[in-house]
Design a protein with these regions (language model features):
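Membrane-embedded alpha-helical bundles that constitute the cytochrome b-like, heme-associated redox core
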Residues: 1-203
């Protein structure tokens, strides 16, 4: 029936949207980690700037010189460093509030639990209806998408160990997945869905 036949395109359309949002949440999570590194460096720079101001204030040969204010350049440098720390802290807090790490994990779980079974359901349903498969870009790209989802998930343990190569590979794999989805799966899938609607009846 039409409902069963359209289950695959509807589910895979949802998976495409989930892939887009997973990419967004993943990049936000990566940005959060990078901000943590930047914030650590900025705090060290701010501490060094404040120390320079304090050392200059106490470096005079006499009490009168010691009480002299530090040069404006040192004060400005310390102020600028503090401003950078404040800006990065605020930016990090905003991203943390988005809870992107957990969202990214949840979307990945959905793609594995729904996307891969539905990717298999498509050709199975076609074979049950037509008695044969129709090899072409849609089928080949679908196999590629499902395989790349599995590869991306397989990289997670190494990513959790802090391996940068795994993180880079994870991003690259998912970028290819998006390309296959957008360039092959969506256009060819819409054509197939139109034929299914034309040749089937409810339910």
């Amino acid at each position: 029936g039409r409902i069963i036949s359209l289950a695959h395109p509807v589910a895979m359309g949802g998976c495409f949207l989930a892939t887009l949002y997973a990419g967004y949440t993943g990049l936000q999570w990566r940005m959060l980690r990078e901000l943590g590194v930047e914030l650590k460096e900025a705090r060290a720079a701010a501490s060094a700037a404040q120390k320079a101001v304090q050392e200059h204030a106490g470096a005079g040969a006499s009490d009168e010189e010691a009480l002299a204010p530090p040069p404006p350049s040192l004060v400005q440098a310390a102020s600028d460093a503090d401003a950078v720390v404040a800006s990065l802290t605020e930016k990090r807090s905003v991203i943390q509030a988005g809870n992107f790490r957990d969202r990214h994990y949840q979307l990945g779980t959905i793609l594995l639990a729904v996307g891969i079974p539905m990717a298999l359901e498509g050709p199975v349903n076609t074979y049950m209806r037509a008695g044969k498969l129709f090899p072409g870009p849609h089928v080949y790209a679908g196999v590629g998408v499902a395989s790349l989802w599995a590869i991306a998930a397989a990289l997670v343990p190494e990513m959790q160990k802090g391996k940068e190569w795994a993180r880079t590979a994870h991003i690259g794999v998912n970028a290819v997945t998006f390309g296959l989805f957008a360039y092959y799966q969506i256009p060819t899938g819409l054509e197939i869905a139109a034929k299914v609607i034309e040749k089937t009846k409810f339910p």
